[in-house]
Amino acid sequence: MKKTDELRTIRIDPLITPSELAKKYAITSEIMDNVIITRQNIARIMTGEDLRLLVVIGPCSVHDPIAAVEYAHRLYELRKKYQDRLEIIMRTYFEKPRTVVGWKGLISDPDLNGSFRVNHGLAVARKLLLDINELGMPAATEFLDMVIGQFIADLISWGAIGARTTESQIHREMASALSCPVGFKNGTDGNIRIAIDAIRAAQARHLFFAPNKDGQMTINHTSGNPYGHIIMRGGRTPNYHAHDINSAIEHLREFNLLEHLMIDFSHGNCLKEHIRQKDVAKSVSKQISQGSKTIFGVMIESFLEEGFQTVKENQPLIYGKSITDACLNWKDSVLIIKQLADAVDTRF
């Protein structure tokens, strides 16, 4: 029989439905309360009602659930210690956008070997989010695939749309439907206008096509997300300095948007040298201590061990070390969090 479609599809595997996965790994009332309260706290920080600083910190990507849980335990102690000045949330990224090709994250390839056991990856990711939230540690993630959010979004307190997808219409539409505050990164070239356009688009009502929790394709009508914001992640040059922030605020003001933004210490702002995140932290802390109220949040790439490692066949991985972007180690992360908390003292 002749065909005119699916000519380049080599395999189609059955996928568990979001409702089936949620039934197996069910959210508890305590976790639900934690997610709701954290989202509300972030919204209040964004609007300036809460003077604390949002800190999204954690590994570039999650590849080892055991190491991620250990990191969450450590981070929760800092969350409690600095809760009067910081709203600390753990970065739990399960999807990785690639410039060309590469490992695309725990959900698509949990075994790190190209076997693509996606159903297992979804189960591992959801179970991990339950474990982390159960500690009292809220979770953040990037929403990349249009379907994966259906499996985990109920456990996410803050979401991001990455630099490569901020300009995408379908991601803006998805953001308009998400129940959590959503940050839009500026473009990889440093263009902040696309992020501002994304904020405006996500505030509006949209419709898009997506499966529901039972796997039935549906037409989603959204109300719009009022808590979109820009994440300054640098580009060809860093954009965390005071003049960059002032310029971004002027653009936000032009469209009557909330005059608050987030600074990513990594990526273009550290010139892709992870250790320079400490320099960004020093500069941002100084701006906050000198009275800047426009910086409502920061993002830091951090793990148990410093740097990154390459996955090699038949070679064990170093525990607690990133397999994607290089991260700061735990010791430096503790120092940066204290530095930020001290800077925020001036707001009170």
From Swiss-Prot:
It comes from Buchnera aphidicola subsp. Schizaphis graminum (strain Sg). It is an enzyme of class 2 (transferase). Keywords: Amino-acid biosynthesis, Aromatic amino acid biosynthesis, Transferase. Transmembrane segments: none annotated. Gene3D superfamilies: Aldolase class I. Pathway: Metabolic intermediate biosynthesis; chorismate biosynthesis; chorismate from D-erythrose 4-phosphate and phosphoenolpyruvate: step 1/7. InterPro entries: Aldolase_TIM, DAHP1/KDSA, DAHP_synth_1. GO terms for biological process: amino acid biosynthetic process; aromatic amino acid family biosynthetic process; chorismate biosynthetic process. GO terms for cellular component: cytoplasm. Its EC number is 2.5.1.54. The lineage of its organism: Bacteria, Pseudomonadati, Pseudomonadota, Gammaproteobacteria, Enterobacterales. Belongs to the class-I DAHP synthase family. Stereospecific condensation of phosphoenolpyruvate (PEP) and D-erythrose-4-phosphate (E4P) giving rise to 3-deoxy-D-arabino-heptulosonate-7-phosphate (DAHP). One of its GO terms (molecular function) is 3-deoxy-7-phosphoheptulonate synthase activity. It catalyses: D-erythrose 4-phosphate + phosphoenolpyruvate + H2O = 7-phospho-2-dehydro-3-deoxy-D-arabino-heptonate + phosphate. This is Phospho-2-dehydro-3-deoxyheptonate aldolase, Trp-sensitive. NCBIfam families: aroFGH, PRK12755.1, PRK12756.1. It holds the Pfam family DAHP_synth_1. PANTHER family: PHOSPHO-2-DEHYDRO-3-DEOXYHEPTONATE ALDOLASE DAHP SYNTHETASE, PHOSPHO-2-DEHYDRO-3-DEOXYHEPTONATE ALDOLASE, TRP-SENSITIVE.
